[in-house]
Amino acid sequence: MSFNLIVDQGNSACKVAFIRNNGIESISFLPGKAGQALSHLVAPHRFDKAIYSSVGLPDEEAEAIVRSCAAASLMMGTETPVPLRLQYDRRTLGADRLAAVVGAHSLYPNTELLVIDAGTAITYERVSAEGIYLGGNISPGLHLRFKALHLFTGRLPLIDPSGISPKIAEYGSSTEEAITAGVIHGLAGEIDRYIDDLHAKEGRSAVILTGGDANYLARIIRSGILIHPDLVLLGLNRILEYNV
């Protein structure tokens, strides 16, 4: 029984979770670096354990805050032990990717897993039923595909995918529709291919989708999936409990 603080520093924002007895009690989003906003958020609380993780260079101020507000703390690094065996160069593996697969394996042990994190980039991670991280792939995310077509061509417009319906025509009847159909159908086909390969090769298996675009992508993928938007936070909590 513990009350834990999870601080996940991303590229443009910081996600802070309070987890009590392995269940998420609250999640807060802090723009930019955590700093003073984090200090105000955690000030009324005293945590049993705390973990700080960053996809880039660590924020020393945030690390100091995390250390000061808990009885025991952990700064996530490339040498931090995790409850998985890794077949990947740990030095090049992002903390968010690692936390996602740890979280997935903790939720679905003894299961062949494909973990899809749909953010700026889309990552595809494979975890064996025995708890071995077999590796992963990285692909451009939904928004990045639209931006690339606009930035690296002469006249193609920028399409905002935020308002696009999941029901897309097979072929477009305008340039805007053609871009939309090409990106959406292409991405859906890519994801379905990974899922089909998993199910064809493995018996008991599960596909877990997380990340900012997870809910939208779940509506365009024909294969059955499980959605866990807070997978990285759950994984960081599992790593914290494993070490402290």
Curated annotation (Swiss-Prot):
Listed GO MF terms: ATP binding; metal ion binding; pantothenate kinase activity
Ligand binding (substrate): 94-97, 175
A GO biological process held by the record: coenzyme A biosynthetic process
Record pathway: Cofactor biosynthesis; coenzyme A biosynthesis; CoA from (R)-pantothenate: step 1/5
Subunit organization: Homodimer.
Active site: 96
Cofactor dependence: NH4(+); K(+)
Sequence positions that bind K(+): 117
GN (gene name): coaX
Catalysis: reaction(s): (R)-pantothenate + ATP = (R)-4'-phosphopantothenate + ADP + H(+)
PANTHER family per the UniProt record, alphabetical: TYPE III PANTOTHENATE KINASE (PTHR34265:SF1)
Pfam families: Pan_kinase (PF03309)
Binding site for ATP: 8-15, 120
UniProt subcellular location: Cytoplasm
Keywords: ATP-binding, Coenzyme A biosynthesis, Cytoplasm, Kinase, Metal-binding, Nucleotide-binding, Potassium, Transferase
Cofactor descriptive note: A monovalent cation. Ammonium or potassium.
UniProt-listed SUPFAM superfamilies: Actin-like ATPase domain (SSF53067)
Family stated for the protein in its record: Belongs to the type III pantothenate kinase family.
EC numbers for this chain: 2.7.1.33
This protein's name: Type III pantothenate kinase
Any Gene Ontology CC annotation: cytoplasm
Enzyme class: transferase
Keyword tRNA-binding in annotation: no
Purpose of the protein: Catalyzes the phosphorylation of pantothenate (Pan), the first step in CoA biosynthesis.
